[in-house]
Amino acid sequence: MTEVLWPSAVEKQALGLAARLARQGVRPGERVLLTGENSSSFVAALLALCHLDVSIVLAAPQLAADQLAHMTRTANVRWAVAGATADGIPLPGSAVLDLTAPAAPDPADPADPAAAGTIVLDRWESRADAVVMWSSGTTGAPKSVVKSGRAVLENSRVTAAHMGYTRDDVLAPLLPFSHQYGMSLLLIWWLTGCGLLVAPYRRLEPALTAIAESGATVVDGTPPTYHGMLTLFARNPAHLDGLRKVRMWCVGGAPLNRPLAERFRDATGQPLLDGYGMTETGNIALALPDLAEGCGRPLPGVEVRVRASDEDAGEGEVGEVEVRTPGRLEGYLRPDGSLAPYDEPWFRTRDLGRIDGNGVLHVYGRMNAVHRLGHTLYPEYLERRAEECGAPVKVVALDDERAGAVLVFFVQDAVHDERVWRGRLRACLASYERPNAVVTLPEFPVNRNGKVDVNALKELAAALLRGGGDGR
């Protein structure tokens, strides 16, 4: 039976967890690690920790023991609330609460704020280090990002209002709760008072069944998730019959390419609503059903500019996206756990994008410039150009002493071979933009966050070139 979580029911579980943690000695301001798979217990634990006014350190449950040890050491973690990974946490057993064994509220001490009848977020909202999250590290080493409660909650409120969520909605996040995107949706659910479906996001077929049974109205996922959906729709079109109540299909976590967007609209009759946000800034811009272009316009109170050659870019000109927002980070943690404040008014995203004549933000990906044959190229901008040929493309640039860079194009296509794609790319790219090698793959590798595993592709590219291959 598919279960939809409603705030009033989860609140009781959260108060029980809060009371149990308080009895163990958890105090306001202490750093508490929160890790675990998506579950009602994880949702309750997040609310309990907010209620206790602690500094929440979010960690993915798939992390190796040495990575968890690094996080707990850097963040000066005192306690942990965890699920199946509890045994691998480098803390005394008495400091770890098993997320899979929640307790009921203890009415013995009604004066204890943890035993109060409602979850209160006011104190946590005033905390400067309310959340410590690690950026995904898709293209480099992860950074420990410190966010205030005010930044996190206000961004959630603005997002909820912008998207038009109501108490009648049922949200279905097909992504991990232990990251910025997932946590944001949990807080939006709580603030809105709507329903929440906890679906098995790594197993799409049962997830689609749960969406249909629950009457979910808003679905969120990453591009690979929607690629998987389209495969299931093609195999069994009956899946679509149960999804008629979904009014918004939202996508984030990685750039949305045009072929995927067009295929999804063709299959469902509805657009994929792209969004743009970062761990450091929260949500920045979100597309809407009546403006399903690019990443939409910036949220109220969020300013976005595009800079090219140290000056503001012209309308439609591509450059680095910079953001000024109340939702930005307080700073990063130093190796000793102290805060290195981020004081710049504008946050440099290191993402490449443009703003069109309607004020819509278009983001192409990371701003990793390479120099090749006397030209400055941006691999992720080349990806968007190449995808006009009809399939998802990832471009890996490797250093080359003579040319400056060697370009390997990976194409997600299980039907056509490299020779076909060389011809297509030759027609849509300038000579200095064309690949040295083309590799077709039935599916791109993905990491634990559901994003394309760029490091795995780099290893494939390096191995190809070491072996003298050219992808033909």
What are these regions (language model features)?
Residues 4-8, 130-157:
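Conserved AMP-binding A3 loop
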Residues 19-63, 174-176, 376:
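Conserved AMP-binding/adenylate-forming
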Residues 108-134, 140-141, 164-170:
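Conserved pre-ATP/AMP-binding loop-to-beta segment of ANL
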Residues 153-170, 178-218, 232:
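Conserved AMP-binding/adenylation subdomain of ANL enzymes
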Residues 216-221, 232-292, 303:
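Gly/Ser/Thr-rich phosphate-binding loop
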Residues 297-301, 311-344, 375-377:
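Conserved ATP/PPi-binding loop(s) of AMP-dependent carboxylate-activating enzymes
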Residues 325, 352-433:
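AMP-binding/adenylate-forming catalytic core of the ANL superfamily
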Residues 396, 408-410, 421-472:
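Conserved C-terminal "lid"/linker of ANL adenylate-forming enzymes
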